[in-house]
C-alpha cells in the first residue's frame, strides 16, 4: 500500500466525516479505528484515516497516540499527513490541538503548519482568523455551551496561540484570493518570522482548493474535512489517486434489527431526538439516575428487547445545557461524561447481543465509546446520509454491521429516520 494521503483524526465521527469527504472526491478511502495491528491486511487505498479518541484526553496521551498513527501512515507512503480536528475547533487552552500539532509538525520536519477548520459547505468559515458557525462567531453559537470544550473565543489565532509552544500567524482572505503561490509564499514568510502555525481564512469551497494546492507538497497540515476536500481535489488535479466513483457501495444488505443511541447534548441532537419520537419508541434516560447508581443499562435493554421485533428504538441520555452543567457541578466534568459514555457503550453491546446489526450513534465521544466497546477496527465507506455523515460498513468482522456515527451538531431534524432508511 502506497498512500496518496494520510490522516490522523481526533475523534471517530470526525474521521467518518473526513473519510466521507475523501471518498466523494474520488479517493479510495479506508477508516481504521486506531493504528492497525501489525500484519493486519487492508484493502488497497489512496487514503487512510486513522480514527483516534484523543480530543478530550490528557494532552500527553493524545500526542503519543497521534505520533504513533503518523508513523504508521508515513511507513505506508503518505507524503502528506493531515491532523483532522473538528470544524468548530473543539479544544481548551491545554489542548489538545496545539500540543498534537506541535509534535506532528516536528516529526514531519516542517517549520510551519497551515491550519484551518473551515468547511463552507457545512456552514463553517474563517475570516480574518475568526471562526463563524453559519452567520455568527463561534463564541455566540451553541458551541459556547459545549459540555467538554466550551468555545468562548472565535479568534483562532488567539485560541491556538494559547495551546501551542510556537507563535501563530494568519493567512488572510486577500492572500488566499491571490492563489496557491501567494499562500505558499506567506507560509514561508511566517516561518521566517518564527511562526509555527498559520490560521488560514476560507469563505468559499474554492478557497479550500487554493489551500490544498498550496500545501500538497508540504508534509503536514491541520484542518477539518474542508481542508481534506481541498487536498483531495489537488491530488486529483495532480494525477494522484484512482478517481473512484464517489459514494462507494456498502455491499450486500445486512439483516438484523436496528437501533439508535444519542449521547450528544447539542441543540441539533436534542431536536433530532424529539423528532424521532414520531417514528419510533424513544427511551430518555436520566443521566442523574445513572450517576446515582441506578441500573439504567438493564432498564434500557429491557425496553429495547420488548420492542426490537417490531422496529427500531432510540435510547438517549441527551440533556439540555443547564442540566449538563448541574451534573458536571455535582460529579465533575470528566466523571459525568465518562459514566454516560460507558453506559451507552454497554447498551450498544447489549443491543448487538440481541441482534442489532444497524446502529446509529449521535455524539463524538459516545461514538468513540461505542466503537471501542464493540471492538470494531475498520470501516468501508458507503453513501452519505447527511453532510459529513456516511453509512459505514464494518471490515474484518465475521458478521457485518452498518453504522452511522454522527457528530452532535450534524444532520437535520429527520436524521435518525433518514439514516435508518438508508441502511435498510
From Swiss-Prot:
The protein's enzyme class: transferase
Positions with a binding annotation for ATP: 264, 363-366, 408
Single GO MF annotation: kinase activity
Keyword Secreted: no
InterPro entries hit by this protein: 4-carb_acid_sugar_kinase_N, 4-carb_acid_sugar_kinase_N_sf, NBD_C, NBD_C_sf, OtnK
E.C. number: 2.7.1.217
Keywords of the record: ATP-binding, Carbohydrate metabolism, Kinase, Nucleotide-binding, Transferase
Catalytic reaction(s) noted: 3-dehydro-L-erythronate + ATP = 3-dehydro-4-O-phospho-L-erythronate + ADP + H(+); 3-dehydro-D-erythronate + ATP = 3-dehydro-4-O-phospho-D-erythronate + ADP + H(+)
Domain of life: Bacteria
Function: Catalyzes the ATP-dependent phosphorylation of 3-oxo-tetronate to 3-oxo-tetronate 4-phosphate.
Family to which this protein belongs: Belongs to the four-carbon acid sugar kinase family.
NCBIfam families: OxoTetrKin
Name assigned to this protein: 3-oxo-tetronate kinase
Organism: Methylobacterium radiotolerans (strain ATCC 27329 / DSM 1819 / JCM 2831 / NBRC 15690 / NCIMB 10815 / 0-1)
Gene that produces this protein: otnK
